[in-house]
Design a protein with these regions (language model features):
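Transmembrane alpha-helices and adjacent helix-loop boundaries
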Residues: 1-161
Length: 161
């Protein structure tokens, strides 16, 4: 129930909830609140991804591991997880990109993030095009790095495909 509730709430609402309700009595920075709020939000998403990956493994694989006499940990380590990780990697990449985009909400409660700096540059120079193009390129590069990293992990882990 917790995971479904957290995942159904928009990340910006969760950030505001943590900033104005959970951490209202404590003086903490907005960046810290964003890290905690987005960590909670992302953990719900990642748990769903793990659940999807584990559900993809056929029940007969569990029985086969038991028949081989593998303990609970060894069953998951050698039989279940190698098969479950493969469908998880693209989903982790997608969720990581969603998390990257959600970090732009940090500017609503903190003083410094990339989008907030862009706004400050616009106020000083009256030019919005160059800062927005720069921020877009930075986010594009970060997004591509996520995809390239997870692709490398995928290829290294499953080089037999």
């Amino acid at each position: 129930y917790f995971i479904k509730t957290i995942h159904d709430v928009p990340s910006i609402v969760l950030i505001f909830f943590f900033y104005y309700v959970v951490f209202a009595a404590v003086q903490v920075g907005g960046i810290f609140v964003c890290i905690v709020a987005l960590g909670v939000y992302t953990s719900g998403s990642f748990i769903k991804v793990i659940d999807i990956g584990l559900s993809q493994v056929d029940a007969n694989q569990h029985y086969a591991a038991q028949m081989l006499g593998l303990s609970g940990w060894k069953k998951y380590r050698y039989v279940i997880l190698p098969q479950a990780v493969k469908p998880m990697i693209p989903l982790f990449a997608a969720e990581s990109k969603v998390l990257l985009r959600a970090t732009t909400y940090a500017g609503y409660i903190s003083q410094m993030d990339l989008v907030k700096v862009t706004e400050m540059i616009r106020k000083e120079t009256y030019d919005m095009l160059v800062p927005l193009v720069f921020v877009s390129i930075v986010f594009l590069i970060l997004s591509k790095l996520i995809v390239i990293s997870l692709d490398a992990i995928y290829k290294k882990a499953f080089n037999y495909d």
